[in-house]
Design a protein with these regions (language model features):
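Positively charged, small/polar-rich N-terminal and surface patches that mediate targeting and assembly
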Residues: 1-112
Length: 112
């Protein structure tokens, strides 16, 4: 099993969720996060002049899937979240040793 973590633009969350659902993936976790990449935030122009925003609002999408589903999940998230601009985000793949369904105590791949 693998956990796919994607940090994406807030406005791309709905299209990503809909894309995952179209592909048959319904279980996910969403977390509002803030961060920055190589660009170190961004500089905006206001009435009082330029000002810097160090941390940008993003959304983290987490999906735990079987190893053979990872490529499809990555493709779907990338396809629905890509704008081609700086700040589109990142996707991370993390090994998952095991999983437990709290309600039943069931362990392993059947929990996902």
């Amino acid at each position: 099993m693998k956990k796919v973590e994607a940090i994406i633009r807030e406005e791309k969350l709905r299209p990503v969720i809909e894309g995952l659902e179209e592909d048959g993936y319904f279980g996910l976790t969403i977390t509002e996060v803030s961060g920055r990449g190589r660009q170190k935030g961004l500089t905006l122009q206001g009435r009082a002049g330029e000002y810097k925003v160090d941390l940008l609002p993003k959304v983290k999408v987490e999906v735990v899937v079987m190893d053979n589903d990872v490529a499809q999940i990555i493709n779907t998230i990338a396809r629905f979240s890509r704008t081609g601009e700086i700040g589109d985000g990142k996707i991370f793949i993390i090994p998952v040793e095991d999983a437990v369904r709290i309600r039943t105590g069931e362990v392993g791949e059947n929990t996902i």
